[in-house]
């Protein structure tokens, strides 16, 4: 009996220790802090540069600075604004963002950077740029706040809005699945490749052709329909039949499937065999690669000139095919190797050597919290600001005026983009309900809302397996708290002691691997 009491006391001691260190909404606040500290600057640094009159003028950007929330009164005076005041006056609790900019003229002197106000960023309560950050219980009460309030939400036009955690399939990871009826023996390998906010879904499918056709077909953004995999591998630099076959697998049966596809696809490339015989080995390689690129060009830019078709096909391959590997032409062979490995894995599923992935396994899922979703939103909003700025500068030049960066920036473009998305929940990429009105029915209801996890799957479809409780959710997702009705199993809640880990920088991981750390 004493032993049981002792164990119970120790268990609650551990729970207390956990909450002394972590808060229930830490995942939102830490993610937003990272977004403010690192990702905003990264978005600005990686955005397309603004160039005018074919490079005669160029806008250069520097460091971004964010001030803590303040308000300008009618008499022109500035004063700090706290969340309580924003709620009572139906205001948006937001921070002023300024960006260092300068306009460079070709052949002209280098000008100094000037600070330009670019818009307002909605501030998450209790984040690093919030006035409530680091305040004691007594100070919070003096500012009209509930000291037990967790924070982690926004105030837009006086309304409290919470960004819900979104559950998605893990990016940049090969997911193998069987499709269709069992007797069809069809399978698919999918990769959701993500780089700088751009999402490219690459789907490689194996299916038996009805008459004559290829077994392996691939689809990726900006290329209509499906194209034979072997043609894409050739376009990526695996010029000869032998290179394609050996890169896919050492297994003879898999090599035969690739050989059959090569034979069928050669007819589609319209090769001039007489011309090929006269070429030396290096020129023959170039000819085969160019023919494959031409085939893709006919899909992406039908009816255009040959040079444009080739240029457009190369651009699509570099930018939209597996962008997480890289967007430079030098990365094409790496992409070919990745696709070849993906093909072998797919063929192993077809032959029964490998089991398909369980899409509902939590290893194959990732949770996107406030910082990740705000990053997507700001990237699109900043692109809109850049386009508007480019238009304003072009107008100034057309009127014969000397362009000015300060006059070209319309701060309401960025502000309205961010405010509208958080106020309505309509996010970039056509997603709805990403931000919701914070549940204030009870304190427990508020905490529950802040720890909600939402699946993007359609509510009108059965999705029995996705709605089921999966063994890998143990300790991560609450097995009990899910609504009844169409949202059952698709709207979940984090377990009490669950903590969301943050993704690390890929370059740091590569450095560790180079040092010899395997696992």
From Swiss-Prot:
GO CC entries: cytoplasm; DNA-directed RNA polymerase complex
SUPFAM superfamilies, per the entry: beta and beta-prime subunits of DNA dependent RNA-polymerase (SSF64484)
InterPro entries the record matches: DNA-dir_RNA_pol_su2, RNA_pol_bsu_protrusion, RNA_pol_Rpb2_2, RNA_pol_Rpb2_2_sf, RNA_pol_Rpb2_3
Cysteines engaged in disulfide bonds, as pairs: none
Subunit structure: Part of the RNA polymerase complex.
Similarity-based family: Belongs to the RNA polymerase beta chain family.
NCBIfam families (UniProt xref): PRK09606.1
Protein name in the entry: DNA-directed RNA polymerase subunit Rpo2N
Organism: Methanothermobacter thermautotrophicus (strain ATCC 29096 / DSM 1053 / JCM 10044 / NBRC 100330 / Delta H)
Name of the coding gene: rpo2N
């Amino acid at each position: 009996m004493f032993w049981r009491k002792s164990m119970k006391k120790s268990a609650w001691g551990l729970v207390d220790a956990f909450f002394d260190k972590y808060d229930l909404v830490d995942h939102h606040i830490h993610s937003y802090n990272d977004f403010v500290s690192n990702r905003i600057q990264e978005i600005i640094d990686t955005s397309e540069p603004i160039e005018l009159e074919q490079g005669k003028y160029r806008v250069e950007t520097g460091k971004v600075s964010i001030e803590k929330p303040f308000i300008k009164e009618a008499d022109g005076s500035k004063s700090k604004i706290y969340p309580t005041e924003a709620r009572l006056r139906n205001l948006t609790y937001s921070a002023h963002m300024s960006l260092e900019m300068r306009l460079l003229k070709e052949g002209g002197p280098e000008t100094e950077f000037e600070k330009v106000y670019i818009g307002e960023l909605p501030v998450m309560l209790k984040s690093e740029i919030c006035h409530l950050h680091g305040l004691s219980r007594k100070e919070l009460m003096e500012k009209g706040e509930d000291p037990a309030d967790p924070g982690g939400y926004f105030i837009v036009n006086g309304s409290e809005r919470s960004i819900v955690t979104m559950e998605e399939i893990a990016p940049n990871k090969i997911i193998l699945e069987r499709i269709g009826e069992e007797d069809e023996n069809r399978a698919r390998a999918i990769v959701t490749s993500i780089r700088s906010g751009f999402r490219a879904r690459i789907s490689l499918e194996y299916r038996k052709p009805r008459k004559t056709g290829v077994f392996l077909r691939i689809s990726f953004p900006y290329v209509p329909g499906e194209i034979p995999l072997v043609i894409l591998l050739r376009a990526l630099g695996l010029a000869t039949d032998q290179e394609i076959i050996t890169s896919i697998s050492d297994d003879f049966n898999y090599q035969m499937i690739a050989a059959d596809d090569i034979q069928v696809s050669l007819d589609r490339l319209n090769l001039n065999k007489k011309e090929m015989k006269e070429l030396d080995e290096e020129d023959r390689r170039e000819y085969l690669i160019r023919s494959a690129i031409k085939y893709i060009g006919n899909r992406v830019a039908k009816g255009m000139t040959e040079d444009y078709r080739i240029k457009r096909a190369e651009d699509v391959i570099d930018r939209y095919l597996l962008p997480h590997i890289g967007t430079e032409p030098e990365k094409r062979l790496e992409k070919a190797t990745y696709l070849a490995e993906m093909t072998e894995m797919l063929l192993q599923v077809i032959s029964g050597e490998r089991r398909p992935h369980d899409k509902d396994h939590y290893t194959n899922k990732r949770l996107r919290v406030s910082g990740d979703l705000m990053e997507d939103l700001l990237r699109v909003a900043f692109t809109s600001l850049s386009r508007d700025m480019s238009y304003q500068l072009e107008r100034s030049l057309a009127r014969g005026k000397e362009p000015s960066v300060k006059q070209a920036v319309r701060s309401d473009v960025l502000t309205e983009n961010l405010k509208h998305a958080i106020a309505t929940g309509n996010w970039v990429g056509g997603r709805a309900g990403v931000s919701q009105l914070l549940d204030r029915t009870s304190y427990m209801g508020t905490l529950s809302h802040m720890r909600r996890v939402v699946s993007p799957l359609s509510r009108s479809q059965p999705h029995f397996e996705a709605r089921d409780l999966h063994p890998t959710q143990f300790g991560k997702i609450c097995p009990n708290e899910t609504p009844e009705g169409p949202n059952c199993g698709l709207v979940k809640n984090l377990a009490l002691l669950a903590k969301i880990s943050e993704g690390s920088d890929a370059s740091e991981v590569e450095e560790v691997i180079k040092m010899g750390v395997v696992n």
